[in-house]
């Protein structure tokens, strides 16, 4: 069994969708100060794997563990430790950027408006704090979603295509924040189609081979 007592472990995970075997015995480990870059062609199960890892989808076979224990047995502790960003920013259009952060982050921990505004500042969208999400550009929404991840103060980041709709500056900023998170003792599992420009302990897993 592939189990890490100081991080995340995925051991021989299998997922089917109807007759299609989407994940075929996927295993991985991720420890503090590490980044795992997951790549692969469309339809190879990258998003499915992230959903399994964050506990949104139960695999037909296999085990996901956190600190040596099944995530189902330490659900509260695990959910407190992780921050998940899907491939869509998932913002409520009628709420402002700040309200979106307050709603999402408030489910995990107590947070002040000042902390949330600081996260928006770090991701370059402080000027959007009081604007409804529906008027923001795709790139701005992506930056707000990144601010949400920062605000959660989680040790484990699970990011699905975090560079989508970002310009060069936004891509560089996201890479820098990823590097800072990992260098600070965090861990990150990132689905991305292109190479990641970060100078950390980075592993790679390509699905569909």
Task: Name each model-derived stretch.
Residues 54:
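Helix-to-loop junction immediately C-terminal to a conserved catalytic motif
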Residues 102, 113-129:
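Conserved ABC ATPase "signature" region
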Residues 62-73, 77-78:
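Conserved ABC transporter NBD signature motif
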Residues 157-161:
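Catalytic Walker B motif of ABC-type/P-loop ATPase nucleotide-binding domains
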Residues 88, 93-109:
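Q-loop/switch helix immediately C-terminal to the Walker
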Residues 146, 185:
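Hydrophobic anchor residue at the start of the ABC signature
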């Amino acid at each position: 069994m592939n189990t890490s007592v100081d991080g995340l472990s995925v051991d021989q995970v299998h997922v089917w969708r109807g007759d299609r075997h989407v994940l075929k015995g996927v295993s991985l480990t991720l420890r503090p100060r590490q980044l795992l870059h997951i790549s692969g062609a469309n339809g190879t199960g990258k998003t499915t794997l992230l959903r399994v890892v964050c506990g949104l989808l139960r695999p037909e076979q296999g085990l996901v563990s956190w600190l040596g224990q099944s995530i189902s047995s330490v659900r509260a502790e695990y959910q407190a430790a992780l921050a998940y960003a899907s491939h869509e920013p998932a913002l409520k259009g009628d709420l402002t950027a700040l309200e979106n952060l307050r709603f999402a982050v408030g489910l995990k921990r107590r947070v002040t408006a000042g902390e949330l505004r600081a996260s928006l500042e770090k991701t370059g969208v402080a000027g959007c704090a009081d604007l409804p999400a529906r008027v923001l550009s795709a790139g701005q929404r992506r930056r707000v979603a990144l601010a949400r991840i920062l605000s959660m103060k989680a040790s484990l980041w699970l990011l699905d295509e975090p560079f989508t709709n970002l310009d060069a500056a936004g891509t560089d900023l996201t890479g820098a924040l990823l590097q800072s998170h990992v260098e600070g003792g965090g861990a990150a599992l990132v689905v991305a189609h292109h190479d990641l420009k970060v100078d950390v302990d980075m592993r790679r897993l390509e699905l569909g081979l």
